[in-house]
């Protein structure tokens, strides 16, 4: 993060408890800038908040985005209260501005928001033990089940065609043809990897068109590090980063969780010998996910869960490679060839999944 901000003047527009003391940058995620605001309460206690600058270059209508988050978290809170849970820890809680809004728009046209900090819980960039993935699966399954009676029509489509893999492929081919930075000649193998799987990009899109898959309220970005894990119990307690909550497929959420969770390395690991799809981790997540929400899904949704894991991993790799070809304009990079490294990493996982697809299917059907 190259730019510095006057955090105190920004945060003072929100209804915070205590006196603002310090702020720390929180370097995590590819899209928004995130910071931790530390306040001191009346009795000297530490109160933390999460401050974020919404990336309005990507999220073209932050007002609609925040309305989605507000509606979804309000619905989830009601469910948590019905279940005698803790609504302050089990979902995101928006801190309103002094004008009663869910965001603050400063004079530089930046959009800022604040959430309560969830204490006693952590996120993990990589799975440290299989039990974490089982409990993450339970948390995501619970998230989908809690929203199963939410009216999808109430949600804005904040990023149209976000997981439309057919259109993603068309955009990828456009990037190859334009070759803005002259990089295509050096990544022919990776480009061919994508082209050889073009038919895969049509499968779920066609099923939606044929009304074979129901649209649900979905998270659409269920990386493992978007699940808060309780530090004491090891249970998955909350699903966070709700910017892409909109109508979608349950398959998207399952698939992206496997992409980020059932791997032996970070998504930008350069040494591909360290990057492997872990079938045991896949099974732990599938077990938790289906235990929590399996009875809410249709036969076709269940059948295509394994394929969705491969497709979401493929889509992510394709997007990384497209961004590399376009000159690294979407995902934040921290080194040369960062997006290319990410793409190769994801394609290695896709290859592994293709070899394990029969076993992946057997695992799903063993838990329904």
Language-model segment annotations:
Residues 1-24:
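Juxta-kinase regulatory segment immediately upstream of eukaryotic protein kinase catalytic domains
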Residues 23-25, 30-40, 46-171, 250, ...:
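Conserved ATP-binding subdomain of kinase catalytic cores across diverse folds
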Residues 24-28, 52-53, 59-63, 121-136, ...:
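ATP-dependent phospho-/nucleotidyl transfer catalytic cores
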Residues 38-41, 229-231:
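Short, low-complexity Ser/Thr-rich regulatory SLiMs
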Residues 107, 214-219, 246, 277, ...:
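Secondary-structure capping and boundary motifs in well-ordered enzyme cores
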Residues 229-294, 334-339:
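Active-site Asp-x-Gly
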Residues 281, 285-368:
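Helix-rich C-lobe and terminal helical cap/extension of kinase-like folds
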């Amino acid at each position: 993060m190259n730019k510095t901000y006057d955090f105190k003047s920004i945060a003072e527009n929100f209804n915070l408890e205590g006196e603002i003391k310090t702020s720390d940058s929180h370097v995590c995620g590819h899209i928004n800038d995130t910071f931790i605001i530390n306040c001191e309460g009346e009795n000297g206690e530490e109160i933390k908040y999460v401050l974020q600058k919404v990336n309005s270059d990507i999220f073209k209508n932050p007002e609609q985005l925040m309305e989605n988050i507000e509606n979804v978290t309000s619905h989830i809170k009601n469910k948590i209260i019905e279940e005698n849970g803790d609504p302050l820890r089990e979902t995101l809680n928006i801190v309103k501005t002094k004008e009663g809004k869910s965001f603050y728009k400063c004079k530089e046209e930046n959009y800022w928001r604040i959430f309560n900090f969830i204490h006693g819980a952590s996120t993990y960039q990589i799975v440290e033990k299989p039990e974490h993935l089982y409990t993450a699966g339970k948390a995501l399954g619970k998230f989908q089940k809690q929203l199963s009676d939410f009216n999808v029509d109430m949600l804005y489509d904040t990023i149209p065609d976000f997981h439309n893999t057919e259109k993603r492929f068309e955009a990828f081919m456009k990037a190859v043809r334009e070759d803005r930075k002259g990089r295509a000649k050096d990544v022919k193998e990776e480009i061919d990897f994508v082209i050889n799987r073009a038919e895969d990009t049509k499968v779920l899109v066609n099923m939606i068109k044929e009304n074979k898959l129901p649209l649900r309220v979905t998270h659409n970005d269920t990386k493992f590090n978007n699940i808060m894990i309780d530090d004491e119990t090891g249970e998955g307690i909350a699903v966070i980063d709700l910017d892409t909550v909109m109508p979608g497929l349950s398959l998207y959420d399952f698939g992206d969780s496997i992409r980020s969770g059932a791997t032996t390395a970070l998504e930008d690991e350069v040494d591909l010998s360290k990057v492997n799809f872990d079938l045991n981790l896949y099974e732990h997540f599938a077990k938790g996910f289906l235990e929590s929400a399996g009875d809410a899904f249709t036969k076709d949704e269940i059948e295509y869960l394994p394929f969705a894991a491969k497709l979401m991993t493929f889509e992510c790799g394709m997007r990384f490679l497209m961004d590399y070809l376009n000159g690294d304009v979407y995902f934040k990079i921290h080194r040369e060839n960062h997006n290319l490294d990410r793409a190769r990493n994801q394609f290695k996982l896709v290859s592994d999944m293709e070899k394990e697809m029969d076993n992946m299917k057997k695992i799903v059907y063993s838990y329904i």
